[in-house]
Structure formats: structure tokens, C-alpha cells
């Protein structure tokens, strides 16, 4: 069996412990990184967010609301998670919808993916929207979104007179068919 060892986050093993996992019969290296989290008073009594399976990309975020929040059809609400995270430079946290809430209840995120930057130190909050025809109630401890870490590439724009042409050109918004 051959192993390919990718660069760890930040290029240093000290910032990331690599562990091996066996996923669907394939050997894979998964990066594991510890993220500092501060819990707020309204988080008390809830478990820390975690991966639900060995191969899960994201950790499920929980609603830390004190009272149930009912979303009428078309309504949106800012739902607290009760946590503040400290990401190292070079990482972002992407806040994504949970597919089960979307397919079963029409609940998704209004801005998806939401981005938590490495220099943000406020509470992680989730903007939920109800696309269904019936009301939906968010209760304390409900898994409402998932958080996936991603590496960030800094962008520096450079103004030029011409761009290299491509076969696609300026075609967009459905130009390739359905």
C-alpha cells in the first residue's frame, strides 16, 4: 500500500496532526487540527459541535436559542450557536446547510456558504430561511448547519489590457444548455 503525505496546514506538522482513516475501503490521510472555542453563557448544557461520522467533512453546529424560534414560510432568523472560534491565519470556516433539513423541511441558509474569517472573534450565528409551505420550529440543541474548514488563498488583483482567450469565452448563465 502506498501513502501520499500531503503538506499539513501551514506547512508544519506542529500545527496539524495527521491521522489515518479507512474510508470505504480506501486508505486516506485526513488533516486534524485543534481549534480554540469559547462558549457563551447561552451555550451551557449543550455538547460541543463534532463530526457525526469518521468521514464527515463538517461538524454540526447546534442551535443555542433559549426559546424555540418558529420560522413561518418565507421567514428568516438569526440563530445563535453560543460559540466563538479562533481560527489560525490561512483558514476560514464555511457555514453550510444541512441536507436533511433542506430536503425534509425546506430549511436552508440564506447566505451559503457563510464565511467565518480567521480574524473574526464574534459569536458564530446562522441565518436560516424557511422555503417550505409550513412553519418550522428551531429548538435548543437542534443541529442547524455544518461548519467546514478550508484553506484561504489571498488574492491580489492585477489590471491588464487583455486576457488570454478561452473556448468558453464570455458565455455564462446557462449557455452550455440546461
Give the label of every model feature segment.
Residues 1-12:
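Extreme N-terminal basic, low-complexity initiation segments
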Residues 14, 21-24:
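Intrinsically disordered, low-complexity proline-rich regions
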Residues 2-4, 17, 26-178:
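DUTPase catalytic domain/fold
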Amino acid at each position: 500500500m502506498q501513502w501520499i503525505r500531503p503538506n499539513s496546514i501551514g506547512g508544519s506538522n506542529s500545527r496539524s496532526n495527521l491521522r489515518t482513516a479507512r474510508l470505504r475501503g480506501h486508505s486516506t490521510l485526513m488533516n486534524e487540527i485543534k481549534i480554540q472555542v469559547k462558549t457563551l453563557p447561552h451555550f451551557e448544557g449543550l455538547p460541543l459541535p463534532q463530526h457525526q461520522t469518521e468521514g464527515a467533512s463538517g461538524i454540526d453546529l447546534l442551535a443555542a436559542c433559549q426559546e424555540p424560534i418558529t420560522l413561518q414560510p418565507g421567514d428568516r432568523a438569526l440563530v445563535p450557536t453560543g460559540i466563538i472560534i479562533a481560527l489560525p491565519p490561512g483558514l476560514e470556516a464555511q457555514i453550510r446547510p444541512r441536507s436533511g433539513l433542506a430536503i425534509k423541511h425546506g430549511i436552508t441558509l440564506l447566505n451559503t456558504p457563510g464565511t467565518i474569517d480567521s480574524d473574526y472573534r464574534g459569536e458564530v450565528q446562522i441565518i436560516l430561511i424557511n422555503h417550505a409551505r409550513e412553519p418550522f420550529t428551531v429548538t435548543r440543541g437542534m443541529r442547524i448547519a455544518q461548519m467546514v474548514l478550508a484553506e484561504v488563498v489571498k488574492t491580489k488583483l492585477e489590471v491588464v489590457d487583455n486576457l488570454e482567450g478561452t473556448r468558453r469565452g464570455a458565455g455564462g448563465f446557462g449557455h452550455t444548455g440546461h
